[in-house]
């Protein structure tokens, strides 16, 4: 398993809505994540800065990255774009993080 971490950014005032939307994550989106090898996926929020920290374990990063090509993922991005910083294709603005420590 590969460990993948990134940060994303909420627009101010959207903490509750972001949590609500993820509490109600579409079953099709859950299935797509799992089908692309995602496991142990967590997202944390720094409430002072509206910064999100995402962590996911993936079987193969190249396979996981292909989720971006799916219709359900693109629909999810469009749904989330009004409440978080997004790219022109509606994907969230994300900064991949480099792992600097790991304790097994």
From Swiss-Prot:
GO terms for biological process: rhamnose catabolic process. Disulfide bonds: none annotated. Keywords: Carbohydrate metabolism, Cytoplasm, Isomerase, Rhamnose metabolism. Coiled coil: none annotated. Its EC number is 5.1.3.32. InterPro entries: Dimeric_a/b-barrel (IPR011008), L-rhamnose_mutarotase (IPR013448), Rham/fucose_mutarotase (IPR008000). It is found in: Cytoplasm. Pfam families: rhaM. Its main location: cytoplasm. Homodimer. PANTHER family: L-RHAMNOSE MUTAROTASE. Involved in the anomeric conversion of L-rhamnose. This is L-rhamnose mutarotase. It comes from Listeria monocytogenes serovar 1/2a (strain ATCC BAA-679 / EGD-e).
